[in-house]
UniProtKB/Swiss-Prot annotation:
Catalysed transformations (reactions): XMP + L-glutamine + ATP + H2O = GMP + L-glutamate + AMP + diphosphate + 2 H(+)
Organism: Ruminiclostridium cellulolyticum (strain ATCC 35319 / DSM 5812 / JCM 6584 / H10)
Root EC class: ligase
EC nos: 6.3.5.2
Active-site positions on this chain: C82 (nucleophile), H169, E171
Binding site for ATP: S223, G224, G225, V226, D227, S228, S229
Single annotated GO MF: ATP binding
Keywords carried by this UniProt record: ATP-binding, Glutamine amidotransferase, GMP biosynthesis, Ligase, Nucleotide-binding, Purine biosynthesis
Oligomer status and interactors: Homodimer.
Gene Ontology cellular component list: cytosol
The protein's name: GMP synthase [glutamine-hydrolyzing]
Domain Glutamine amidotransferase type-1: 5-195
InterPro entries from the UniProt entry: Class_I_gatase-like, GATASE, GMP_synth_C, GMP_synth_GATase, GMP_synthase, GMPS_ATP_PPase_dom, NAD/GMP_synthase, Rossmann-like_a/b/a_fold
């Protein structure tokens, strides 16, 4: 990839991936790497600029995360955010102290709008603070360019050394002018021109795939979800009939989804498609398993085993395609970062894979970028904007062990929920919505009889990047209609609850 590059050094804060997302929204490509990456590795990216993220640690703690000090001598512009600002100060001879009053939430700051970082930003502007410590004495040569009532060094800079830092979080939506500040860093300070465009990504990917694959055969894992569908069409554009797509119907799909996938890819696209119906195989392997991580690993392994079995039938296959995307990689752990949960595409692979290589053409893209790539490729809108669906399917939306009866129950409830959301015209406003079959039963009354059936959870969120998400404010009358239909039309359900937890602290999926 020959795009301009911004490097994001990850110090473990909760908003870190939003930084990468905001940079890309500004048409500049960036990658996230661990804070302790070697100087040689950092230099190898030939980056136009570097951003230090926030983090949960105090720079005053023993063993606090620190980057290679040589970063400050590269001459590359550096922007430190929150912890990144405090780290910059301490490593360059300044000092950090505990604040008399912790700042958390929206705070008004006063900025020096004559400085390049704050061009087109109001002198008094709102920003999002989340800190207990602050820089009380900036390093030699630095000047203060912003302050708040409780933070005398809200931002600082050393223009000659191209070093900049802010105590607040410009990447979050609660800092209204944050995007402008980041663009100022990218364009006014780093000199970026903005060459990260989806059309060039698609074109470059097609060329790279052709060069990599040559005349060899490729097998694609197709689920019918957005990620694997875009990956399949992208690969097909590059190599045509050398691609064979295997659609594994593991019995964990949504209602009618298996037939819809076959209809679209076999008839609408001239793609070699093999549908493998193996519901019994998966359910047998998952029998009695309730731990979500174990479910994911088993499903990932079975997927690969199925692919290997089919590959033997069709002859020599050199490459396996997967629809891994950037949030999959991030949430499965970057460097020393804690693993939130393994993702099917990256954590479910067994150690031995009987293929030459895994190809992950979407590995560097966020979800909305995948959709844009799909539109660029001419994929129909109803497929590009299909609801996100995890690789393990409904297995991680049934809490506890799996049975066919539970899956069928969940399928019916999910279908009703999606049908009513679409009928209400909310399907484009809510980014992801689904039902979860809990492993809890509750007492109810239907007619004159006592019932003791499952409690069902509704989950719906709004998000721009799926790294953070807010629970969707669905109107009460819609929720009432969904609840009434489900308890009347689906056996085994007598109670509906609505999940009003954001991400973080929760993940979007329950497992």
């Amino acid at each position: 990839m020959n795009n301009e590059m911004i490097l994001v050094l990850d110090f473990g804060g909760q908003y870190n991936q939003l930084i990468a997302r905001r940079v890309r929204e500004a048409n500049v490509y960036c990658e996230v790497i661990p804070y302790n990456a070697s100087l040689e590795r950092i230099k190898s990216y030939n980056a136009k600029g570097i951003i230090f993220t926030g983090g949960p640690n105090s720079v005053l703690d023993e063993g606090a995360p620190k980057c290679d000090p040589g970063v400050f001598e590269l001459g590359i512009p550096v922007l430190g955010i929150c912890y990144g600002m405090q780290l910059m100060s301490v490593m360059l001879g300044g000092s950090v102290t505990a604040a008399n009053q912790r700042e958390y939430g929206k705070v008004e700051i006063c900025v020096d709008k004559s400085q390049p970082l704050f061009r087109d930003v109001d002198e008094n502007t709102i920003c999002w603070m989340s800190h207990t410590y602050y820089v009380d004495t900036p390093p030699k040569g630095f000047e203060v360019i912003a302050k708040s009532a409780n933070c005398p060094t809200g931002a600082m800079q050393h223009v000659e050394k191209n070093l900049y830092a802010v105590q607040f979080h410009p990447e979050v939506m609660h800092t209204p002018k944050g995007k402008e500040m980041l663009k100022n860093f990218l364009y006014n300070i780093c000199g970026c021109k903005g060459d990260w465009k989806m059309s060039s990504f698609v074109e470059n990917s097609i060329n790279a795939i052709r060069e990599k694959v040559g005349d060899k055969k490729v097998l694609c894992a197709l689920s019918g979800g957005v990620d694997s569908s875009v990956a399949a069409v992208l690969i097909h554009k590059a190599i045509g009939k050398q691609l064979t797509c295997i659609f594994v119907d593991h019995g964990l799909l949504r209602k009618y989804e298996g037939d819809q996938v076959e209809q679209i890819f076999r008839k609408q696209y001239d793609i070699n498609l093999i549908r493998v119906n193996c519901e019994d195989r998966f359910l047998q392997r998952l029998k009695g398993v309730s731990d979500p991580e174990t479910k994911r690993k088993i499903i990932g392994e079975e997927f690969i085993r199925v692919f290997e079995d089919e590959a033997k039938k069709i002859g020599k296959v050199d490459f396996l395609v997967q629809g891994t995307i950037y949030p999959d990689v991030i949430e499965s752990g970057i460097g020393d970062a804690a693993v939130i949960k393994s993702h099917h595409n990256v954590g479910g692979l067994p150690e031995h894979v009987d293929f030459k290589e895994i190809i992950e053409p979407l590995r560097s893209l966020f979800k909305d970028e995948v959709r844009r790539a799909g539109e660029e490729l001419g994929i129909p809108e109803d497929l590009v904007w299909r609801q996100p669906f995890p690789g393990p399917g409904l297995a991680i939306r049934v809490i506890g062990d799996l049975t066919k009866e539970k899956l069928d129950t969940l399928r019916d409830t999910d279908y009703i929920f999606r049908e009513e959301i679409k009928a209400a015209g909310l399907d484009k406003e809510i980014n992801q919505y689904f039902t979860v079959l809990t492993n809890m039963r509750s007492v109810g009354v239907m007619g004159d009889e006592r019932t003791y059936d499952y409690a069902l959870a509704l989950r719906a969120v709004t998000t721009t990047d799926f790294m953070t998400a807010d629970w969707a404010r669905i109107p009460y009358d819609i929720l009432e209609k969904v609840s009434t239909r489900i308890v009347n039309e689906v056996k085994q359900i007598n109670r509906i609850v609505y999940d009003i937890t954001s991400k973080p602290p929760a993940t979007i999926e329950w497992e």
